[in-house]
């Protein structure tokens, strides 16, 4: 038997539906994602920490879940909002239905609401703080009060919260269909050593680095530059992650010191924003951010348009770029900056997600650019 659930926004909007996950309360910034598939990858993406994700595609849960599709060791999304939960989860890789998965991971979620109306509110008013209450004896007043009590993501440093606490090595490569697994590559077959700062790294990023010949050492977000340089890396990677980049002063300082060397640097998502801040630019909070797998981005050097996966609520302010940083990619949705490169260093970054998971891999060649830079330095 289903239990009732409420989604309340800080502006007082109320949506009533049914609980499809754990009972209880969750609060966070409510955002919408336009991807048609990949809900498990989205839920386990650390970049969604403290965010309640609304999926605009109406039918979510058709394919169930599988451990192989997780992008981290746990669910990071604060909650899930969907329109319709299919009665049947059908896929040869399915090991657990979506409701079972949500309950097992203690995720509060709601289905059966008008996600189109909700998305219009978020588009017109911007991302809002919200609360999901699920179970018996829930009240609209309590949900609204909880939503208004959430402080918001501006000024919130979440990178050090989601980051690994210990350094570790990574040699698992991209998924293989024939084995339904991610093969481990022998270190002797990986010519490049990359140190990756974990600000909330997705596993498919690490796998794509390995697939291109990189032995990856993952270090905590607060690792000093001196410890990274002592590992003698061929390249340094700055990962994706949640929250506001500006409070991450430890990361900005480490990146500044690494940029004083000639070691190639590549950043994605939060790593892109941190590279910009370390180079003297500024970041801004976006209205409703970019969340989806169908965002067109243009390469400003070639004019080529690529469809990309996006997940960010902050952006680099192009007007603040110093003279030694140039724009190399732009969003064709709103013109916001999507990529930068240093003109005086071997350092570049991309705001979206070249690793996809979920989404298209049009921008995956940026990983090749990174390995090419490491090869050139040798």
Curated annotation (Swiss-Prot):
Region (CPSase), start-end ranges: 1-189
Membrane spanning residue stretches: none
A GO MF label: carbamoyl-phosphate synthase (glutamine-hydrolyzing) activity
Domain Glutamine amidotransferase type-1 as annotated: residue spans: 193-378
Pathway: Amino-acid biosynthesis; L-arginine biosynthesis; carbamoyl phosphate from bicarbonate: step 1/1; Pyrimidine metabolism; UMP biosynthesis via de novo pathway; (S)-dihydroorotate from bicarbonate: step 1/3
Positions with a binding annotation for L-glutamine: 47, 241, 243, 270, 273, 311, 313-314
Name of the encoding gene: carA
NCBIfam families registered for this protein in UniProt: CPSaseIIsmall (TIGR01368), PRK12838.1 (NF009475)
Native organism taxonomy: Bacteria, Pseudomonadati, Pseudomonadota, Gammaproteobacteria, Pseudomonadales
A GO biological-process term: glutamine metabolic process
Function: Small subunit of the glutamine-dependent carbamoyl phosphate synthetase (CPSase). CPSase catalyzes the formation of carbamoyl phosphate from the ammonia moiety of glutamine, carbonate, and phosphate donated by ATP, constituting the first step of 2 biosynthetic pathways, one leading to arginine and/or urea and the other to pyrimidine nucleotides. The small subunit (glutamine amidotransferase) binds and cleaves glutamine to supply the large subunit with the substrate ammonia.
Name of the protein in its database record: Carbamoyl phosphate synthase small chain
